[in-house]
């Protein structure tokens, strides 16, 4: 099979990369009705599989779970989760032939095996659904021409998909129809009904493409969402300890600092995050972020280039074929880092202290968010897609670090995201070491003293922060998410 994106000509590539339309709420007036009375079978009962299924059932849809015979016979976790929640569970052979919509919510590396197993069992004219398009775009999976292929991609972990639905809301969602597989022209109706059944239409839905979702998703998770947080955690911890900070305090400042900082980011973008600083600290954070952007631009561009060309995917799939040797080695090495093994700090760190003593961390967030956004947009991805794959998801990933450090982040994210995270962080850490050596007192671990500031300089910095394109599009998109709850757990 050939990488689907690479089979397209340049015009087709640009058209699919640039497909992005914010859908009006009136387009979801029929809710999930298009799928009511039809049989929906979900393959996979992980975080997305279970929580999407719960939402869809609560929206009036007929949901069942198809699992491998071994998973049922051995009563594995997927079987237990589905049965304990009252769902019908059966083998592929028992459930797939009757399904009107088969939703594949297994991990990326299992998609080819799953699709090749279920496709011969699917009835003529059925639909196949994904929540991430890697299998279609990067693997180039060929789907029977009578099958409609759609995607509904919530821009949050599965647990958030469920919690927001229970509150009567939802999470922002991308939907798409694979242009090679829409024989009856009903793909968009299916995708809209599925998105409505998960509650996504209440928070905002983007009509996108499989290509745009995959390329932007890979870029976001490799750089700002996971790679930058991992590299920043390791660099900042080592810097603090080297300068005499108690390792336990340093660990807590970083572990919970990302979450506290990005909670402000979630509520009001980079503008609000920077406004939490004193004026002297804001000017310093801005200067540091500009330095970081200059240093890291080639690295961000390399990741985007390798994602667009398919180089990243081919390398990762080669590691899949080699029993994840690289991935497992990097995972083990990360677990042995000083940050991961540092003792816990029993004292309390106040919310403002995370900002005052984390100027460098704020600069890293600002630089990483803006660079990821800019690099995606420069590659033809529309601003709304770039926003969701950079700034929007960052607080959710930071929340995983607050739970159990980098270990938890790498457990929660997909293997695809974890592999890309390691590629980025292993390159970024040595790249930034000279920069770290030149830091000034007050950049990290201590507060910058109050002092006089130049009014014109402060005005210009404020204007630069607020006029960035990600702040403009973010303000619009956050208007649809004002009901989302705070997710911070730091005390």
From Swiss-Prot:
Catalyzed chemical reaction(s): (2R)-2,3-dihydroxy-3-methylbutanoate + NADP(+) = (2S)-2-acetolactate + NADPH + H(+); (2R,3R)-2,3-dihydroxy-3-methylpentanoate + NADP(+) = (S)-2-ethyl-2-hydroxy-3-oxobutanoate + NADPH + H(+)
Positions that bind Mg(2+) 1: 217, 221
First-tier enzyme category under EC: oxidoreductase
Pathway linked to the protein: Amino-acid biosynthesis; L-isoleucine biosynthesis; L-isoleucine from 2-oxobutanoate: step 2/4; Amino-acid biosynthesis; L-valine biosynthesis; L-valine from pyruvate: step 2/4
GO BP, one annotated term: isoleucine biosynthetic process
Domain KARI C-terminal knotted span(s) in chain numbering: 209-344, 345-484
InterPro entries: 6-PGluconate_DH-like_C_sf, 6PGD_dom2, KARI, KARI_C, KARI_N, NAD(P)-bd_dom_sf
Domain annotation KARI N-terminal Rossmann: ranges: 15-208
Keyword vocabulary terms for this entry: Amino-acid biosynthesis, Branched-chain amino acid biosynthesis, Magnesium, Metal-binding, NADP, Oxidoreductase, Repeat
Cofactor(s) recorded in Swiss-Prot or TrEMBL: Mg(2+)
EC number, UniProt record: 1.1.1.86
Active-site residues annotated for this sequence: 132
Binding site for Mg(2+) 2: 217, 389, 393
Annotated positions binding substrate: 414
Protein's UniProt keywords contain NADP: yes
One Pfam entry name: KARI_C
Binding site for NADP(+): 45-48, 68, 76, 78, 108-110, 158
Transmembrane segments: none
Comment on bound cofactor: Binds 2 magnesium ions per subunit.
Disulfide bridges in this chain: none
The protein's role, per its UniProt record: Involved in the biosynthesis of branched-chain amino acids (BCAA). Catalyzes an alkyl-migration followed by a ketol-acid reduction of (S)-2-acetolactate (S2AL) to yield (R)-2,3-dihydroxy-isovalerate. In the isomerase reaction, S2AL is rearranged via a Mg-dependent methyl migration to produce 3-hydroxy-3-methyl-2-ketobutyrate (HMKB). In the reductase reaction, this 2-ketoacid undergoes a metal-dependent reduction by NADPH to yield (R)-2,3-dihydroxy-isovalerate.
Name of the protein described by the UniProt record: Ketol-acid reductoisomerase (NADP(+))
Organism: Salmonella heidelberg (strain SL476)
């Amino acid at each position: 099979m050939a990488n689907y994106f690479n089979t397209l000509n340049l015009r087709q590539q640009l058209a699919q990369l640039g497909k992005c339309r914010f859908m009006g709420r009136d387009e979801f007036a029929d809710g999930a009705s298009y799928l009511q009375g039809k049989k929906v079978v979900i393959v996979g009962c992980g975080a997305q599989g279970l929580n999407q299924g719960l939402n869809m059932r609560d929206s009036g849809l007929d949901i069942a779970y198809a699992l491998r015979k071994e998973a049922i016979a051995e009563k594995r976790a997927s079987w237990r989760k589905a049965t304990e929640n009252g769902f019908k569970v059966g083998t592929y052979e028992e459930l797939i032939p009757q399904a009107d919509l088969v939703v594949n919510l297994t991990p990326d590396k299992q998609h080819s095996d799953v699709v090749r197993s279920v496709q011969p069992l699917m009835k003529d004219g059925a639909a196949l659904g994904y929540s991430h398009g890697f299998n279609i775009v990067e693997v180039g999976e060929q789907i029977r021409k009578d099958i409609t292929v759609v995607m509904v991609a919530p821009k949050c972990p599965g647990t958030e998909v469920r919690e927001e639905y229970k509150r009567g809301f939802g999470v922002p969602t991308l939907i798409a129809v694979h242009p090679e597989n829409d024989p009856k022209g009903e793909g968009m109706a299916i995708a809209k009904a599925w998105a409505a059944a998960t509650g996504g239409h209440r928070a905002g839905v983007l009509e996108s493409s499989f290509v745009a979702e995959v390329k932007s998703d890979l870029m976001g998770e490799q750089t700002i969402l996971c790679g930058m947080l991992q590299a920043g955690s390791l660099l900042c911890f080592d810097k603090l300890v080297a300068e005499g900070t108690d390792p336990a305090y340093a660990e807590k400042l970083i572990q919970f600092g990302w979450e506290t900082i990005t909670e402000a980011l979630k509520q009001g973008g980079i503008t609000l995050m920077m406004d939490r600083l004193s004026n002297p600290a804001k000017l310093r954070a801005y200067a540091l972020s500009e330095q970081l952007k200059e240093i890291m631009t080639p690295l961000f561009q390399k990741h985007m280039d390798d994602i667009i060309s398919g180089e990243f995917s081919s390398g990762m799939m080669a590691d899949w074929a080699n029993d994840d040797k690289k991935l497992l080695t990097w995972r083990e090495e990360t677990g042995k880092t000083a940050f991961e093994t540092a003792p816990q700090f029993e004292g309390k760190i106040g919310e403002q202290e995370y900002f005052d003593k984390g100027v460098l961390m704020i600069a890293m967030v600002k630089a990483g968010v803006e660079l990821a956004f800019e690099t995606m947009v420069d590659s033809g991805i529309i601003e709304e897609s770039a926003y969701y794959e950079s700034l929007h998801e960052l607080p959710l990933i930071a929340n995983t670090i607050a739970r159990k450090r980098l270990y938890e982040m790498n457990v929660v994210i997909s293997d695809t995201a974890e592999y890309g995270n390691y590629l980025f962080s292993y390159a970024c850490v040595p790249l930034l070491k000279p920069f770290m050596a030149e830091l000034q007192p007050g950049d990290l671990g201590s507060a910058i003293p109050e002092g006089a500031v130049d009014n014109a300089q402060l005005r210009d910095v404020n204007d630069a922060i607020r006029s960035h394109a990600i702040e403009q599009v973010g303000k619009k998109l956050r208007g649809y998410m004002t009901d989302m709850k705070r997710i911070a757990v730091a005390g």
